[in-house]
């Protein structure tokens, strides 16, 4: 079995979307996608992750966008840092922090 893990420094998830990350995702749909520098508040991440979930549905990886497991940590300072993780694989538990 092959497991595809992708990591990407997005330098802002909204900027990445404008630059075509959705097209990249449609071609690749990794099993696990780790994102750094998401630079967005929670409500934006939730919306983007739903959009990305729709791509996983289109690619036959999951049945509904809600089946995409997501974990994220938003920076308390607006427009800074932030990380996110998407996977269509089951997540047993998560921990935020070191």
Please annotate each region the language model reported.
Residues 1-6:
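Extreme N-terminal starter segment of soluble prokaryotic enzymes
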Residues 8-9, 25-43:
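Active-site beta-strand/loop signature of hydrolases that rely on acidic residues for catalysis
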Residues 9, 13-16, 50:
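Non-transmembrane, interaction-prone segments in cytosolic or luminal domains
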Residues 14-27:
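Short, acidic/polar
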Residues 17, 43-45:
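Short glycine-/acidic-enriched loop or helix-start segments at secondary-structure transitions
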Residues 39, 46-98:
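Structured beta-strand-rich core segments of catalytic domains in phosphoester-bond hydrolases
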């Amino acid at each position: 079995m092959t497991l595809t893990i992708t990591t990407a420094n997005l330098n802002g998830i909204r900027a990445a979307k404008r630059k075509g990350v959705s097209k990249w995702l449609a071609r690749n749909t990794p099993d696990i996608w780790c994102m750094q520098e998401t630079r967005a508040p929670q409500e934006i991440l939730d919306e983007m992750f739903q959009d990305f979930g729709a791509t996983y549905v289109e690619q036959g990886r999951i049945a509904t966008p809600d089946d995409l497991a997501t974990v994220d940590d938003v920076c308390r300072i607006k427009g800074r840092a932030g990380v996110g993780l998407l996977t269509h694989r089951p997540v047993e538990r998560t921990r935020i922090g070191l």
